[in-house]
A protein has these predicted regions:
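C-terminal segment of classical bacterial N-terminal signal peptides
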Residues: 16-21
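Alpha-helical assembly-interface signal, strongest on the long, hydrophobic N-terminal helix that forms
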Residues: 12-14
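Non-transmembrane alpha-helical segments in soluble domains
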Residues: 52, 106, 217, 292-295
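Helical hinge/lid and interdomain linker segments adjacent to catalytic or ligand-binding clefts
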Residues: 31, 36, 40-134
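Catalytic beta-strand/loop cores that center a nucleophilic Ser/Cys/Thr
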Residues: 56, 62-64, 82, 158-265
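N-terminal export leaders
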Residues: 4-8
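A glycine-rich, often tryptophan-bearing local segment used as a flexible ligand/cofactor-contacting loop or short
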Residues: 93-213
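Extracellular ligand-binding/catalytic regions of CAZymes and related secreted enzymes
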Residues: 25-27, 67, 109, 238-243, ...
């Protein structure tokens, strides 16, 4: 029989114990997918839903899948207000996304409200283009803010969705003109966010983990192979990444910076290259694990 004295002792002990901590809130993840019909060749329920389903099965993640055809293009305030990490896939309908939607995403990244993961062909998504343009503007402004001489900066946006040729000058780039009165005029050509070579042949690619201690590379092999991918070839017209986590190569000699991170204000952007929507890349364990790692790292308090 439990005596009154024992019960009082338990109550007294409990009074000195720290209160139980509230359970950690799950990371709010939004998977945005254009859902082009050709995805059905590899994903019976679309690529975005494949990724969302995997992430939803992992502890500590709350996942919402949205599409371009949803209300507000799947990017309304009701979605973004409840998002910590936005994963973005598009390919054939880049131009249908409203630019003000892309700029709102960038504003939220800069403020630290959200982070973004752009996958494969989303190198030409408007949110990624706008994010890379803003990285370029920020770096350029910071570099010349303390210059003794007067510097005038003109940012030049190229034509959307027109890829560079092999001999095109790499963007972003700066053309400077100095005047006798001490002024310097800079013309800054914003990044094209594309590359001169690609091949949709479904051949293997060979990836190397360049930063094995990076949180995105946690539990990822030093080297691994994807059995069927689309090839992208450098040079990738992007601002210099703050970190390159993975490099990808093909037997034809092509190579690509396939896992790039940029700091943008108080937020971050991660670009992960492997794809094509007709190849089951995102049924492979390693790419899914990389996305999960990226979600957890991008959402971590800084």
């Amino acid at each position: 029989m439990v005596t009154r004295r024992i019960l009082l002792g338990i109550a007294t002990l409990a009074a000195f114990l720290p209160p139980a901590s509230a359970p950690a809130q799950p990371i709010q993840v939004v998977m945005w997918d254009e859902q082009q019909p050709s995805q059905k060749q590899a994903y019976s329920n679309f690529l975005g839903n494949e990724i969302a389903g995997y992430l939803a099965s992992r502890p500590g993640l709350a996942v919402r899948a949205v599409t371009l055809d949803d209300a507000g293009q799947g990017l309304g305030s009701d979605v973004l207000d409840n998002c910590q990490v936005l994963i973005y896939w598009d390919h054939a309908r880049h131009h249908e996304v409203k630019r003000d939607k892309a700029r709102e995403i960038v504003r939220r990244i800069k403020s630290g409200q959200i982070a973004m993961i752009s996958l494969h062909s989303a190198h030409w998504s408007l949110p990624f283009i706008e994010a890379m343009a803003e990285v370029t503007r920020t770096r350029t402004t910071q570099r010349y803010a303390s210059a003794d001489q007067q510097v005038e900066i003109n940012f030049v946006q190229g034509q959307d969705f027109v890829g560079p040729k092999r001999d095109s000058q790499i963007t972003p780039r700066v053309a400077a003109r100095k005047f006798p009165d001490g002024r310097t005029a800079l013309k800054v050509y914003l990044p094209n966010c594309a590359f001169p070579g690609w091949r949709e042949d479904g051949k293997p690619s060979y990836l190397t983990t360049l930063l094995p201690n990076h949180p995105i590379a946690r539990d990822i092999p030093a080297r691994f192979t994807l059995p069927a991918t689309e090839m992208y070839d450098e040079p990738f017209h992007i601002p210099r990444p703050d970190e390159v986590v993975f490099e990808e190569r093909w037997t034809g000699g092509e190579w690509f910076r396939s896992g790039c991170v940029w700091q943008l204000g108080r937020g971050r952007v991660f670009y992960f290259r492997p794809g094509h929507e007709t190849f089951p890349v995102y049924k492979e364990k390693i790419p899914l694990k990389i996305i999960e790692n990226a979600v957890r790292w991008l959402a971590a308090p800084r």
